[in-house]
Amino acid sequence: MILGIDIGNTTSEFGFIYNGKRINSYKLRSDHTKTVDDWLIDISAIFSIEGMKKESVKDCVISSVVPPLEDRIYSACKKFLGKKPLRIGKELKVPIKINYKNPEEVGIDRVVNAFAGVKRYGKPLILVDLGTAITFDVVNQKGEYEGGAIFPGIDSSIEALFSKTAKLPKVSIENVKKVVGKTTVESIQSGIFFGYISLIEGMIKRIIREKGFSPKVILTGGSGEIITKGLEIDHIFDMYLSLEGIYDIYSYHGN
C-alpha cells in the first residue's frame, strides 16, 4: 500500500493505492496559505477518516506541478509517516522518451499520464486531461512522448466569463441536453458543454491527421466525468489515471 499524492493547480488528491488500484482518495483544495502543520493536520484526518494506520503505508509518493505546495506537503508527510516521501521526477524518474524541444518544459503530470496510459492501454495514444487546463498529449507507436496542446480548462473558462461580464451568471454544465438554449443560462451551458466537446473532437481529428496513426483516446481529469457523456468519438474514460500512474512509476523502479 502506498499513499499517492497528486498535487495540482486547483486540487490535490491523496489516494491509498494497492497493487496499482486506487482503494480510496480524498481531494483537497491546493491552498497556498496552508503551512506544513496545516497539511499535517489534513493528512492525519484522512488517515483517521479512512481508519488507516500509518504503519500500513509502505511509502508516500508525490507527483506535483506546484513546487511551493510540494515542499510543504513533502515535509508534512515526512513528519506524519516518519520517512521521506519519494517524488516523481526526482527520486523516481519517469521512464519515457520525450520528443519535446526542451524535455524539462513538460509538466510532470503529463508524462505520468503518458507512462500510465501506455502501461494500461498500449500505444499509440492521445491522452486528454480535463483539469485546470486541458492538455492533449500524444504517445507514438514506439511509446515515446511526442508533445501535445494546452487549452484553458472548463472551470477556468466559466470563471473568466462570469468575472468579466456584468450580467452573465455562473453556471453548472451537468445534464446539458440541447445545443440551442432557450434562456441565458441554457445558452451558456450549451456554449461551454458542446463547445468543449467540439474542441476535443476537433483536436483529436487534427492530431490523427497530422501524425498519421490510429491511436486509442484516453480521457481523464475532474471534468472528464461530464464531458465523456457527450463525446461522439471512441474513447476510454479513466478517472484515476494520474493517481494510479504514480503507483505505476513507483512499481517500475522495483518497489
Curated annotation (Swiss-Prot):
CDD domains in UniProt: ASKHA_NBD_PanK-III (cd24015)
Swiss-Prot/TrEMBL cofactor(s): NH4(+); K(+)
Enzyme class label: transferase
Location of the protein in the cell: Cytoplasm
InterPro entries in the cross-refs: ATPase_NBD, Type_III_PanK
Predominant location category: cytoplasm
Protein residues bound to substrate: 100, 107-110, 184
Catalytic activity: (R)-pantothenate + ATP = (R)-4'-phosphopantothenate + ADP + H(+)
Cofactor note: A monovalent cation. Ammonium or potassium.
HAMAP family, alphabetized: Pantothen_kinase_3
Assembly notes: Homodimer.
The protein, known as: Type III pantothenate kinase
Organism: Persephonella marina (strain DSM 14350 / EX-H1)
Lineage: Bacteria, Pseudomonadati, Aquificota, Aquificia, Aquificales
Name of the gene: coaX
